[in-house]
Structure formats: structure tokens, C-alpha cells
């Protein structure tokens, strides 16, 4: 008997993340285990707005956007670990350490994000993340996010 995967489609992703086009950088969550790991994807197409200027002749996805997408995957894992989305709080990208880039990302690539929760204490979570294309490492980093109440 096969194991049931925990997935998220774009509608569910949008119920957790405040980002919208062109800054919503996660297309689908393939699997997650609350408090442990999350595996998500982003399909990179030539239609991405950043390719207009980075770089028109040789399009390359900016590294900061790869890190932002990793942070969004981290936020999804944080929300799923807390078991609820709340209109009264957000997870903010609070820090990054040990970021390394190993390969460029071009139109047609599919990014695979694997984020792991290391610890959480008083609303601050520490995670590790890797991004791969076709099994080849693109980027790795340690990410911190902080849960904050928001006023309306």
C-alpha cells in the first residue's frame, strides 16, 4: 500500500502566503511533514518578468529570487507546523546564513525546494534549504523566519 502524500495546490498556497504575482514563487507543494520537511516546486518560464532585464540575451533567474522562493517554502512549512493560517499573523523572512549558489537557473528549469525545520523557539524558526534542478544542486542556505502579529 502506498503512503499518502500531503500536497498543496496553488489555491491553498495562496491561503497561507500573502505574496501575489509576480512575487508568488511557489507553484505547488509535492509533500510535507509538519515540523520536519516540505518539498515544493517552481516552474521557471521565459515569461517571468525578471527575465526582461536579467539578462535579455542570456536569461538567468536572480539568486535573490531563488532565496526568496526558498523563504516562501520555509514559510509554508512554518504555517503547516502551526497547523493553521491566521489573518492576524505572518511569518517574516528574518535572516539567512551560509547561502551558496552552484548552478544558474534558466527558462525551462523546474526548481525543487527541500526545506527542513531545525528548531523553533518563541516564534522564531530555523530551517535549512536546498534547491535543485534535475537533481543538481542550485542553492543551499540556512533561513530564519519570525512569526509576528499584524494589525489591521
From Swiss-Prot:
Its EC number is 4.2.1.59. It is an enzyme of class 4 (lyase). GO terms for biological process: fatty acid biosynthetic process; lipid A biosynthetic process. It comes from the Bacteria. Involved in unsaturated fatty acids biosynthesis. Catalyzes the dehydration of short chain beta-hydroxyacyl-ACPs and long chain saturated and unsaturated beta-hydroxyacyl-ACPs. The gene is fabZ. Belongs to the thioester dehydratase family. FabZ subfamily. The active site is at residue 54. Pfam families: FabA. It is found in: Cytoplasm. This is 3-hydroxyacyl-[acyl-carrier-protein] dehydratase FabZ. InterPro entries: FabA_FabZ, FabZ, HotDog_dom_sf. One of its GO terms (cellular component) is cytoplasm. Keywords: Cytoplasm, Lipid A biosynthesis, Lipid biosynthesis, Lipid metabolism, Lyase. Gene3D superfamilies: Hotdog Thioesterase. GO terms for molecular function: (3R)-hydroxyacyl-[acyl-carrier-protein] dehydratase activity. It catalyses: a (3R)-hydroxyacyl-[ACP] = a (2E)-enoyl-[ACP] + H2O.
Amino acid at each position: 500500500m502506498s503512503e499518502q502524500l500531503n500536497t498543496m495546490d496553488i489555491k491553498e498556497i495562496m491561503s497561507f502566503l500573502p505574496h501575489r504575482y509576480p512575487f508568488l514563487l511557489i507553484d505547488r507543494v509535492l509533500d510535507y511533514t509538519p515540523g520536519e520537511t516540505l518539498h515544493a516546486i517552481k516552474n521557471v518560464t521565459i515569461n517571468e518578468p525578471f527575465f526582461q532585464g536579467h539578462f535579455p540575451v542570456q536569461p538567468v533567474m536572480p539568486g535573490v529570487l531563488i532565496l526568496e522562493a526558498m523563504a516562501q517554502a520555509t514559510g509554508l512549512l512554518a504555517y503547516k507546523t502551526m497547523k493553521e493560517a491566521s489573518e492576524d499573523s505572518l511569518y517574516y523572512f528574518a535572516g539567512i546564513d551560509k547561502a551558496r549558489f552552484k548552478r544558474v537557473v534558466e527558462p525551462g528549469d523546474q526548481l525543487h525546494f527541500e526545506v527542513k525545520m531545525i528548531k523553533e523557539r518563541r516564534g522564531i524558526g530555523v530551517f535549512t534549504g536546498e534547491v535543485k534542478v534535475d537533481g543538481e544542486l542550485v542553492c543551499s542556505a540556512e533561513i530564519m523566519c519570525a512569526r509576528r502579529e499584524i494589525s489591521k
